[in-house]
């Protein structure tokens, strides 16, 4: 790369990077400005989500009351921006409103102390008290007729309840995306409550929304963790890699601009600034649709959709085709004598360009692998640019990438083979045993949840063509392992987990993969109560039965971490036979009472 070209790119990049597409005038009243931009419906929805994500235990009616008060106040400010308190920041207005909740101290304990602080400390304090695993009852789906009646009787309240229930269980759910889910939820009821067979129409749609919603929440949680724990440089690096894969025809300056704006949007949402986030996301969608020619040929059908669908579609858009004539990277990043000069002049820009060039050529790599390669390249330049002969020192840098590329390739290959051989349930069990041996201190419910989700990678990714398997699998595993990190941070029990979670975002998955059996762990004493079952086991759904069995499996491994595969398989086969036998018996409870102790004794003997 010619030095002049690099300097001009640096100028372009830094101006684009600092500017982005958002040009915000200062407004007399921020709340009036957002109300006008978003419209009443979206404004109310976002305020409800914000309050539900902060105060996760408050009853629905309390939140609706707060939202109505904020909305009426916003309308006052729209009518007269200089009215009293209209000039206050949104954090001040929202924080003041949260602090009026009478039961704050008794419901949330020390969170009430946040109210003694001033902004911005007060908002930071509220954010720190968001609970990723709130003690809320599982959502039970009513009968279809009951839901349809509620939908017809009061559609607005029905949809608000959906926003409230999802937001309080997922305090980092991407708010504008949750409005999109609510719109789909509404459309499903509007269509299916008219259908001849309401249940056949509605239930698959609700299942799909639930599964997509959980996945969306987990993906956003990783983005927020990345920003909160590793700073915006880590998030920007992730975004450069991902957008360069999606938009390989876009110039580096264009990708940089999009990255800056995406970082702003996600920083706002992760920080609880949901009105600004939704407004800026709409602006970003508008910008992308006005500049399709310089971004991607795949945006057209997204841009014809209404706002919420458009933003969702743009976020999920498939990768554009790679330009046919991309030159080899070696010329600019290995063979050039100017590498150290360019690197020293503007390290982050040079590394950003390297990441952009590498990612647009490799849609077949996971984002996390691309970031590891950029990190390895950076480490090599740090070392070599201080050496006597820098060029000689970094000449083989691309060869050093090979083991980094092969590690996830082999991991995906081995695990997909295991998945094909075992099927999903038994593949989950294999992962349960693997992870319980690695980190036996982690709570059983967390190990079951995380291993079940890790096991879903098979069905999600292993059927894909080779070129799509690694990005699908490794980036999905990063999302699931982030859930483990988030839960573990709340109640830390394992130094190994803390180390893998906090040392490096891009190396989390390899760190967990490399963990061995924890030799220092003192096995858990055998507790017959854990393996005592009753007739209610027979009425459980298939999924609930699996969770019960998997819970028992984790407890077995915690009791005997060095048990062989054969020993564990023998016990689990006996368990399945015992449950099947008693569920077929005339007096189920009597069977469980009689056969249960025999199963426990046989299990202990098998594992002795």
Swiss-Prot record:
InterPro entries: ALB/AFP/VDB, Serum_albumin-like, Serum_albumin/AFP/Afamin, Serum_albumin_CS, Serum_albumin_N. It is found in: Secreted. Gene3D superfamilies: 1.10.246.10. Residues 19-24 form a propeptide. The modification Phosphothreonine is found at residues 107, 444, 446. Ca(2+) 2 binds at residues 37, 279, 283. The lineage of its organism: Eukaryota, Metazoa, Chordata, Craniata, Vertebrata. This is Albumin. Plasma. PROSITE patterns: ALBUMIN_1, ALBUMIN_2. Interacts with FCGRT; this interaction regulates ALB homeostasis. Interacts with TASOR. In plasma, occurs in a covalently-linked complex with chromophore-bound alpha-1-microglobulin; this interaction does not prevent fatty acid binding to ALB. The keyword Coiled coil does not apply. (4Z,15Z)-bilirubin IXalpha binds at residue 264. The modification Phosphoserine is found at residues 29, 82, 89, 297, 443, 513. It comes from Macaca fascicularis. Keywords: Calcium, Cleavage on pair of basic residues, Copper, Disulfide bond, Lipid-binding, Metal-binding, Methylation, Phosphoprotein, Repeat, Secreted, Signal, Zinc. Phosphorylated by FAM20C in the extracellular medium. Binds water, Ca(2+), Na(+), K(+), fatty acids, hormones, bilirubin and drugs. Its main function is the regulation of the colloidal osmotic pressure of blood. Major zinc transporter in plasma, typically binds about 80% of all plasma zinc. Major calcium and magnesium transporter in plasma, binds approximately 45% of circulating calcium and magnesium in plasma. Potentially has more than two calcium-binding sites and might additionally bind calcium in a non-specific manner.
């Amino acid at each position: 790369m010619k030095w002049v070209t690099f300097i001009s790119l640096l100028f372009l990049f830094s101006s684009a990077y600092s500017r982005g597409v958002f040009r915000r005038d200062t407004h007399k009243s921020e709340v009036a400005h957002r109300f006008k931009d978003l419209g009443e419906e979206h404004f109310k929805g976002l305020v409800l989500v914000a309050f539900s994500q902060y105060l996760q235990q408050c009853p629905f009616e309390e939140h609706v009351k707060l939202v109505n008060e904020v909305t009426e106040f916003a309308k006052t400010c729209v009518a007269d921006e200089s009215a009293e308190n209209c000039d206050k920041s949104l954090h001040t207005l929202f924080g003041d409103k949260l602090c009026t909740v009478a039961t704050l101290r008794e419901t949330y304990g020390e969170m009430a102390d946040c109210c003694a602080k001033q902004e911005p400390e007060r908002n930071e304090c509220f954010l720190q008290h968001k609970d990723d695993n709130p003690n809320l009852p599982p959502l039970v789906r009513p009968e279809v007729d009951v839901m349809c009646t509620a939908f017809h009787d009061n559609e607005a309240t029905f949809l608000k309840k959906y926003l409230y229930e999802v937001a309080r269980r997922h305090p980092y759910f991407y708010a504008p995306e949750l409005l999109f889910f609510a719109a789909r939820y509404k459309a499903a009821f509007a269509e299916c409550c008219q259908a001849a067979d309401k249940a056949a129409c509605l239930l698959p749609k609700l299942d799909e929304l639930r599964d997509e919603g959980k996945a969306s929440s987990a993906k956003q949680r990783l983005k927020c963790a990345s920003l909160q724990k590793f700073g915006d440089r880590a998030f920007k690096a992730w975004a450069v890699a991902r957008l360069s894969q999606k938009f390989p025809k876009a110039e580096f300056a264009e990708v940089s601009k999009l990255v800056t704006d995406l970082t702003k949007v996600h920083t706002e949402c992760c920080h609880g600034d949901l009105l600004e986030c939704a407004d800026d996301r709409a602006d970003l969608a508008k910008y992308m649709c006005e500049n399709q020619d310089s971004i991607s040929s795949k945006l057209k059908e997204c841009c014809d959709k209404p706002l919420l669908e458009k933003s969702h579609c743009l976020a999920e858009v498939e990768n554009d085709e790679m330009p046919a004539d991309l030159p080899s990277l070696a010329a600019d990043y290995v063979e050039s004598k100017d590498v150290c000069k360019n690197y020293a002049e503007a390290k982050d820009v040079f590394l950003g360009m390297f990441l952009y060039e590498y990612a647009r050529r490799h849609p077949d790599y996971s984002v996390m692998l691309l970031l590891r390669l950029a990190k390895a390249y950076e480490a090599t330049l740090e070392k070599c640019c201080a050496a006597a002969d820098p060029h000689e020192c970094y000449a083989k840098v691309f060869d050093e990438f090979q083991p980094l590329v092969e590690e996830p390739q082999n991991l995906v290959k081995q695990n997909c083979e295991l998945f094909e051989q075992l099927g999903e349930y038994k593949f989950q069990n294999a992962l349960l045993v693997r992870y319980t041996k690695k980190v036996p201190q982690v709570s059983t419910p967390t190990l079951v949840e995380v291993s079940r989700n890790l096991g879903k990678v098979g069905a999600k990714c292993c059927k894909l063509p080779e070129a799509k398997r690694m990005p699908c699998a490794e980036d999905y595993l990063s999302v699931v392992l982030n859930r483990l990190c988030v839960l573990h941070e709340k109640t830390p029990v394992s130094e190994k987990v803390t180390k893998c979670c906090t040392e490096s975002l891009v190396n989390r998955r390899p760190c967990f993969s490399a963990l061995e059996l924890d030799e220092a762990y003192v096995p858990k004493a055998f507790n017959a109560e854990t393996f005592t079952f009753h007739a209610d086991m027979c009425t459980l759904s298939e999924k609930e039965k699996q969770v019960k069995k998997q819970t028992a499996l984790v407890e077995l491994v915690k009791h005997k971490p060095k048990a062989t595969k054969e020993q564990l398989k023998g016990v689990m086969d006996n368990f399945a036979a015992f449950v099947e036998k008693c569920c077929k018996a005339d007096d189920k409870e009597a069977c469980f009472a009689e056969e249960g102790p025999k199963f426990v004794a046989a299990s202990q003997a098998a594992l002795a």
